Design a protein with these regions (language model features):
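Intrinsic-disorder-associated, low-complexity terminal segments enriched in Asp/Asn/His/Tyr and depleted
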Residues: 4, 8-9
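N-terminal basic/disordered segments at the start of proteins
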Residues: 15-44
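Feature captures the catalytic cores and cofactor-binding loops of soluble hydro-lyases/lyases
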Residues: 27, 44-69, 73-76, 96-102, ...
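Catalytic domains of riboflavin
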Residues: 18, 47, 121-124, 128-130, ...
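General beta-strand structural signal in soluble alpha/beta enzymes
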Residues: 17-19, 40-42, 79-82, 132-137, ...
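Conserved mixed alpha/beta catalytic, RNA-binding, or beta-rich assembly cores of soluble enzyme
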Residues: 22-24, 32, 111-115, 127-238, ...
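N-terminal glycine-rich phosphate/adenylate-binding segment common to multiple enzyme folds
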Residues: 67-137
Length: 274
């Protein structure tokens, strides 16, 4: 069996994991454990879901000094972010000296959105000589390559809708919240807000006959913020009568792949990676 290049890269090295909520963080951790890579966790989940792991640390986002000291103490040069890291309650945060120094930049980023908070943390880590790698570095199998993965393929009108979506994403700013659109022909039926894809889909009329397009924005930081779909997305696609889903090749996180493809084929939904 061919050895995974990520294992070779991290032989006798330590990876730092900033883990938040959603199944994705657990999938990343499971793979790292399976490959016997040395790791430690900084648990940013709401309910401290990694507390049973002996290598897990619960540190407030305001204690940058403690976080950076831990990373350096572990002789760690590289970290990754996985899962949803929610905006903290800044008024109740306890800060250390580095927290006081760096917190203004995090607070101003928080006004823009969750992705901006992580971007500001990456900047801080960078200042301290710590490199952030892609969230799917150890899980390349979660990202699909170009191709059609369902029995149903996009028709001419669908291709026109896809092109409309591509033009829109090329114009959006890197910190806008929009990572998903529903398009039908030349018309954009829905745009994703801060609340995410599910909330956007819930505002659609039944049998809307559009296409869900999830593409990264221009200048988006693909180490931390890849468009993600899973089985729940397909359940919602069926519920609102959408024709299919479109993602960008190798710039996506596709969870529950086998179940999703099975569900898509059963319900005549296309999966197109462009």
């Amino acid at each position: 069996m061919r050895k995974d290049p990520s294992v070779h890269h991290f032989q006798n090295k330590m990876i730092g994991l900033f883990l938040g909520d959603t199944d994705f963080s657990e999938i990343v951790l499971k793979k790292i454990k399976k490959q016997k890579i040395k790791y430690f966790i900084i648990d940013f989940s709401k309910k401290n879901k990694f507390k049973r792991d002996n290598h897990s640390f619960r540190i407030s986002i305001g204690k940058f000094g403690t976080i950076i000291d831990l990373i350096k103490q572990k002789k760690c040069k590289k970290v990754l972010f996985a899962g949803k890291i929610a905006k903290p309650n800044f008024s109740s945060l306890r800060l250390d000296f580095k927290g006081i120094y760096y917190m203004p930049s995090v607070i101003s980023a928080a006004k823009i959105g969750d992705a901006a908070i992580i971007k500001s943390i990456i900047k801080i880590l960078n200042n301290e000589g710590i490199k952030v790698i892609s969230s799917i570095f150890f899980n390349p199998e979660l990202s699909l390559k170009k191709g059609n993965y369902s029995k149903l393929k996009p028709n001419k009108q669908d291709i026109s809708s896809i092109n409309k979506g591509k033009i829109y994403f090329n114009k959006t700013k890197s910190l806008d919240h929009i990572q998903a659109l529903v398009v039908k022909g030349d018309k954009i039926l829905a745009k994703e807000g801060k609340e995410g894809t599910r909330k956007m889909l819930s505002k659609l009329k039944k049998n809307s006959d559009g296409i869900l397009i999830k593409l990264p924005k221009k200048k988006q930081d693909l180490r931390i913020d890849l468009p993600t779909i899973g089985l729940q997305t397909f359940v919602d696609i069926k519920k609102y009568g959408l024709r299919g889903v479109v993602l960008l090749s190798k710039k996506n996180i596709f969870l529950d792949k086998t179940e999703c493809i099975k569900f898509a084929n059963k319900n005549k939904i296309f999966i197109n990676i462009i």
